[in-house]
Amino acid sequence: MLVEAERQTPELVRASYEQTYCEMRLAGYTAVGEFHYLGVPEALAARDAASAAGIELVLLHVAYARGGLPRFRQDSVAAYLEEVEALSSAGLRVGVAPHSVRACPAEWLQEIGRYASDHALPLHVHADEQPREIEECLAEHGCRPIELLARTGCLGAHTVVVHATHADGAELDLLAAAGATICACPTTEADLGDGFLPAERVRTRGIPLCVGSDSNMRIDPLEELRELEGIARRQTGRRGVFSTGELLSFGSAQGARAIGLESWPDIAIDLDHRSLAGVESDCVAAALVAGCGADVVTG
């Protein structure tokens, strides 16, 4: 993957965005928070591809101080924030995204957190995705990742913690107190073998949830929602941990809120699709979440 990332040109990136956003729109995605690791030409390609596909795009520009590929990194947090300004000036809707506590030192997190708050921008960050990340954070900072985000001013109602797979109770309490959102990415977490979101503990604390794909391995928002409920059922030993309405909100209202949108385009469902044959009108939503794939989406 890293070798492929190194050889990407704006033209190749544009082709990838066009393919991916087309697939996403056909599957029922209408808005995307794009973790963007590259420069302005590639960002403009993302904007154009999203517009052509009918996708509302929020570009979450990634901050990388260490690790990753050289082309992902910025020389300083000031240089990173200048890139964010340039993207905004180019007409893109933007958010900030310190990649992780591994990739960004505490000083960067403080500056990015302050900038996000001052400019009312969404702040997305990977945290508690893998045990090794937690071990490294404890060794460097003496605290766990979400605790570090709180210490550096990165936790607030505008914050979205991606994954939170291994968050402990104290960290979940911090998220709840801050009004921060968790973005679960069930199919990617399964693909990488990262573990399971502590869904029941998240639910009981009232922490807002949304879902993301986090990769193009599977592009199916209904599958993400179904897998999230499946995880919760396996953890608790009971059905219906999240209601149908809650699950659909994770993929719509709460997802839009997580990327700073107040509204989002609707989708159309083929009610004559074989997956919905015989389903009464008041059960369509439940049938969508429990048993349908992206092929029921018609527009």
Residue ranges and their predicted role:
Residues 1-56, 79-89:
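Alpha-helical scaffold segments that flank or form the walls of functional sites
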Residues 265-299:
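C-terminal cap of metal-dependent C-N hydrolases
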Residues 100, 158-167, 184-190, 212:
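Catalytic beta/alpha-barrel core
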